A protein has these predicted regions:
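P-loop NTPase Walker
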Residues: 1-109, 115, 216-220, 250
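Accessory N-terminal region flanking or inserted into the helicase ATPase core
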Residues: 1-25, 30, 34-41, 53-55, ...
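Conserved RecA-like helicase ATPase core segment
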Residues: 2-6, 12, 42-45, 127, ...
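ATP-hydrolysis module of ASCE/P-loop NTPase motor domains
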Residues: 17-18, 83-86, 105-199, 226, ...
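Accessory C-terminal helicase-associated subdomains
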Residues: 179, 373, 471-583
Length: 583
């Protein structure tokens, strides 16, 4: 008898419904991850399915790691010894990349290909913008602005076209001149990818789909092997992802999708709610079992009641049409009726005085802690429309100054952290020619904000290295500054090597010696320094900088600070996100 644990009746049905098409409509907080974990274990324990015969696609890498960890733990508790890593678990992009890697010789890619992230892609287009600016009709396609802004627009077009599997030849032969321009843009970009042995996130899925469609044997082998497919967050899938799912599941038809049509958030990325609404009708003459999960285990009844009232209002003057026909009817139920007298959500505001607002929030938090309603600050969450807003980051800084650590890795605070400003300042001091030009504001590409930031970095570095207990660091910086200023030959190091040498000195050595088992906020400086080395290393790779040469050191240094780091600064960088509890 399979042990379902604390599963409710609907969850038990979803866990044991293994064959054919299964649609699990999972409202917020209804235990969908719990259900998926139990379902995978059920397939292995009760149905005798091997891990490599199961594919589970999630929306984020973090969700994939959580699935792997929880499935591994669940199997261990049942004394079932299998290698969970043999399962196809990951995001659509990572799963497609795995299929590509396993069959690389059948793709356009060669060994040692490079995967572009979002910034890499934009930077590639920016550095090759001359190839696009002469395309007929490009000025009508793009808005006015600088090359970086227009490169971003080009990438947006490219990604949408790639993920919708639009045919380039059809674009280029279209009667509409604007469509023909798009076709030429996509053609030029794909030529760049092929020449550079590159692949980006939007083309991973396209390359995988082409591989499967053009190689019948590979497709049939995968169709034979992958007997059970489970797709999470199905409401956020796009056209090409849907095509890949039904291509891989075409033989066994054992496809289970989990999602909530009321939580479709990613239309701007090409996702379509149509996928989940039309899923039950995908295979003719085959039924689809629809299992709604409606018991919410996360929120109290006040929040659930508000949600039900809000989400069920589908017509009225605020709506362009009645959209109740475009959703699965459901009513979420709280697991336990709330007996908490205090409100779950509190709004704290002041009219215009930011200092008063800060003090009011700090006082409220301290009151919660002192009364015992909070045992740990991580039980408190702040909701903002954007964590990157200046008002929000100012609040975070205020709370941290008052002893309350804040975890907000996506607030783009990377370049504002003390350890990063000090490291960049020390690095700049070792290139005195660059610092001299910076002081004279001789760089056209830098704006007032960038000059101000780099000056702050240099001031922070100067103040630190001139302290009496930092003589060795000061000597190190002066020695390399003198060497770089008069360099005529070639060194045996470049920027990343210089950074590693710098990290031998305090405070960087102390930061890197931090015990990694401490809290996420305590290891943030360590992670940030590690990220900085990756950023500098990527610059060296992109610009083929292995060593310093007297002929190129000044130009490359200006490229590093005035272009590469400047663009990263403008775009913002997320900090390390804690995934310690996952595999």
């Amino acid at each position: 008898m399979f042990n379902y644990g604390n599963a409710n009746e609907a969850q038990k049905e979803a866990i044991s419904a293994t064959d054919g098409l299964v649609l699990i409509t999972a409202g917020p907080g209804t235990g969908k991850t719990f259900t998926l974990v139990k379902r995978a274990v059920y397939l292995i324990q009760e149905c005798g399915i091997k891990p490599e015969q199961i594919m589970m696609a999630t929306f984020t890498e973090k969700a994939a790691k959580e699935l792997i960890t929880r499935i591994t733990n669940e199997l261990a508790e049942r004394n079932i010894s299998v290698n969970v890593n043999e399962m196809y678990i990951g995001t659509f992009h990572s799963l497609c990349l795995r299929i590509i890697k396993e069959n690389l010789e059948f793709t356009r890619l060669k060994r040692n290909y490079r995967l572009l992230d979002t910034f890499d892609q934009k930077y590639l287009v920016f550095r090759n913008f001359h190839k696009f600016k002469n395309i007929e009709g490009i000025d009508e396609l793009l808005s006015k602005g600088g090359s970086w802004k227009r490169s971003d627009e080009i990438c947006t077009y490219i990604n949408h076209l790639s993920e919708e599997m639009v045919d380039i030849e059809a674009l280029q032969s279209d009667d509409n001149p604007g469509i023909r321009t798009l076709g030429r843009v996509l053609s030029v970009y794909q030529e760049m990818l092929e020449e550079g042995n590159l692949i980006d996130f939007s083309t991973i899925q396209t390359e995988c789909y082409k591989l499967l469609m053009q190689n019948k044997q590979i497709l049939e082998e995968l169709q034979d092997k992958l007997q059970y497919l489970m797709i999470d967050e199905y409401q956020d899938t796009n056209y090409i992802q849907e095509q890949i799912v039904f291509l891989l599941g075409a033989k066994h038809h054992n496809i289970c999708v989990v999602g909530d049509d009321d939580q479709g958030l990613y239309r701007f990325r090409g996702a379509t709610i149509r996928n989940i609404l039309e899923f039950p009708h995908k295979f003719e003459n085959e039924g689809c079992k629809i299992i709604p999960l409606v018991v919410n285990y996360r929120s109290n009844s006040d929040i659930v009641d508000f949600y039900n009232e809000w989400i069920s209002t589908t017509s009225g003057h605020k709506f362009k049409f009645s959209w109740d026909r475009y959703r699965y009817q459901k009513k979420i139920e709280p697991h336990v009726k709330s007996d908490i007298q205090s409100p779950a959500v509190v709004k704290l505001f002041s009219k215009d005085d930011e200092d008063e607002w800060h003090e009011k929030i700090l006082g409220f938090i301290k009151e919660l802690k002192e009364s015992g309603k909070l045992t740990d600050y991580n039980q408190l969450a702040f909701l903002f429309s954007s964590v990157k807003h200046q008002r929000v980051t100012a609040l975070a800084n205020f709370l941290e100054r008052n002893g309350i650590n804040v975890y907000s890795p996506r607030s783009d605070m990377f370049f504002k952290r003390d350890e990063i400003k000090l490291a960049l300042g020390c690095l700049m001091l070792m290139f005195p020619k660059y610092v001299m030009k910076l002081e004279k504001q001789e760089f056209d590409f830098l704006q007032v904000e960038h000059y101000r930031y780099y000056r702050e970095c240099i001031v922070a570095a100067n103040e630190y290295v001139t302290r009496a207990d930092n003589k060795e660091l000061l000597q190190f910086i002066r020695k390399h500054g003198k060497a770089h200023a008069g360099l005529t030959g070639t060194t045996d190091y470049a920027y990343s090597g210089l950074l590693y040498k710098l990290f031998m000195f305090r405070p960087f050595s102390d930061i890197l010696d931090t015990d990694m088992s401490v809290g996420v906020v305590d290891i943030r400086p360590t992670r940030n320094l590690a990220l900085l080395t990756q950023i500098i290393g990527k610059f060296e790779y992109l610009h083929r900088v292995d060593v310093f040469n007297g002929s190129y050191i000044d130009r490359n240094t200006e490229l590093l600070f005035n272009l590469y780091l400047k663009l990263l600064y403008d775009g913002g960088i997320s900090e390390y996100e804690d995934e310690a509890e996952y595999a």
